[in-house]
């Protein structure tokens, strides 16, 4: 029985620059061969004009209405970082950042690359601060670094996810104070804890040896932790029960691993797939093809297209696409006997450096899929294809139908 390899370029969608997008400019003969022999269209990850987060977009793509199931990004980050969540826990996505003496954000990612020894130093400092603040307020504090500047913070106790972000979401703005979003003791306490953790980290970070070294190297110091997306663990029917599909996900980013785990996918990692713009995809693609014999759908997440977009790096984004395509090439014959989906979870145009709400290209190859006249995978071409305009939440039902796994609606 055939299965599906689903390749997702995070933030892969873009807007034309000089008449081309990164997908259009990239030399990707394997993906374009599948495109020329498949059906294409455009996809609204959530709905037309809605600017998706990566969390809400992946919920929709995996077949779950984010307006119903989304409970905040933090819980998915924690799941993906192998932090076990208990009922009542509140989790936040964190960014290591750089602020000036007035608390104004200079870089929301502290230069993005955080060396392992730097991440360990931050974890050690946060453990010390967390224990002290936790004793003061009667809560447990857990912090864990994940990839690059990213991390997760979990609060356990009489806490609430109903607090505002401290991340201002832009450079040049002052790091915000967490404020309760409801009139409850739990929300007020949570805001106090978050603000004290943030303040004490910034005060203590100045003395970290890693920051002395970073300054000598001409790099930005790590002197702030920005929190956003406070949330709790949602109750979600597993994908096997909801859609009769055995699914696996291969991802290097905690958020995507977490969303996949939340919907009941088996989650894998691969050598070279760290969730960065420098990822090497050979082992990840090899693993994906091997897993296709055990699963109905194998999802492969490519983070580098989003990271390069946020950095405004057109050529870097093209390079990520081309490296993935090159890793696919040795397996083309095997893929031709199965189904292949290529799409994005949202557009992150290089010229905007942020998520935007336009549709992204989508391609479905399969032995029995209608072949349209689109020959190149790109925003400039896929809109002409046979798939038309679909939503993210439509992908899994479409795949279930081709695989013969979906139930008939009515008689």
From Swiss-Prot:
Q: Which GO terms describe its biological process?
A: glycolytic process
Q: Where is the signal peptide?
A: none
* UniProt KW keywords: Glycolysis, Isomerase
For molecular function, the Gene Ontology terms on record are: metal ion binding; phosphoglycerate mutase activity
Biological pathway: Carbohydrate degradation; glycolysis; pyruvate from D-glyceraldehyde 3-phosphate: step 3/5
Protein's UniProt keywords contain DNA-binding: no
Please list the reactions this protein catalyses: (2R)-2-phosphoglycerate = (2R)-3-phosphoglycerate
Name the enzyme's class: isomerase
Keyword Isomerase recorded: yes
What EC numbers are recorded for this enzyme? 5.4.2.12
User: HAMAP family per the record?
Assistant: ApgM_A
Family named by the database record:
Belongs to the BPG-independent phosphoglycerate mutase family. A-PGAM subfamily.
Its annotated function is as follows: Catalyzes the interconversion of 2-phosphoglycerate and 3-phosphoglycerate.
What PANTHER family is this protein classified in? COFACTOR-INDEPENDENT PHOSPHOGLYCERATE MUTASE, METALLOENZYME DOMAIN-CONTAINING PROTEIN
Q: What is this protein called?
A: 2,3-bisphosphoglycerate-independent phosphoglycerate mutase
Q: Which organism is it from?
A: Pyrobaculum arsenaticum (strain DSM 13514 / JCM 11321 / PZ6)
Q: Name the gene for this chain.
A: apgM
């Amino acid at each position: 029985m055939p299965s599906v390899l689903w390749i997702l370029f995070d933030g892969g969608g873009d807007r034309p620059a000089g008449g081309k997008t990164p997908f259009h400019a990239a030399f990707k003969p394997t993906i374009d061969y599948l495109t020329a022999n498949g059906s294409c269209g455009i996809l609204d990850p959530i709905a037309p004009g809605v600017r998706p987060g990566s969390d809400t977009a992946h919920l929709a793509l995996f077949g779950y209405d984010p307006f119903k199931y989304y409970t905040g990004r933090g819980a998915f980050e924690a799941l993906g970082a192998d932090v076990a969540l208990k009922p009542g826990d509140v989790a936040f996505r964190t960014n290591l950042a750089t602020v000036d003496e007035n608390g104004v954000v200079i870089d929301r990612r502290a230069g993005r690359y955080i060396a392992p020894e730097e991440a360990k130093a931050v974890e050690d400092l946060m453990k010390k601060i967390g224990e002290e603040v936790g004793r003061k307020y009667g809560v447990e504090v857990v912090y864990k670094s994940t990839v690059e500047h990213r991390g997760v913070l979990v609060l356990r106790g009489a806490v609430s996810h109903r607090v505002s972000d401290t991340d201002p979401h832009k450079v040049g703005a002052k790091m915000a104070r967490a404020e309760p979003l409801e009139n409850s003791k739990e929300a007020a306490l949570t805001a106090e804890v978050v603000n004290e953790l943030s303040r004490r980290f910034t005060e203590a970070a100045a003395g970290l040896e890693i920051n002395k070294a970073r300054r000598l190297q001409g790099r930005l110091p790590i002197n702030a932790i920005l929190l956003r997306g406070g949330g709790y663990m949602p109750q979600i029917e597993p994908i096997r029960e909801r859609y009769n599909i055995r699914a696996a996900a291969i991802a290097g980013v905690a958020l995507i691993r977490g969303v996949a785990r939340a919907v009941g996918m088996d989650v894998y990692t691969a050598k070279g797939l760290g969730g960065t713009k420098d990822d090497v995809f050979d082992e990840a693609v090899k693993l994906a093809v091997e897993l296709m014999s055990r699963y109905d759908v194998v999802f492969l997440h490519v983070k580098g297209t989003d990271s390069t977009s946020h950095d405004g790096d057109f050529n870097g984004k093209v390079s990520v696409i081309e490296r993935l395509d090159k890793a696919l090439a040795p397996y083309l014959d095997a893929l031709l006997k199965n189904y292949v989906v290529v799409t994005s979870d949202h557009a992150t145009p290089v010229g905007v450096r942020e998520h935007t709400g336009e549709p992204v290209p989508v391609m479905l190859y399969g032995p029995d899929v209608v072949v349209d006249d689109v020959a190149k995978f790109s925003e400039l071409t896929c809109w002409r294809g046979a798939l038309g305009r679909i939503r993210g939440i439509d992908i899994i039902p479409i795949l279930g139908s081709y695989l013969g796994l979906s139930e008939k609606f009515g008689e």
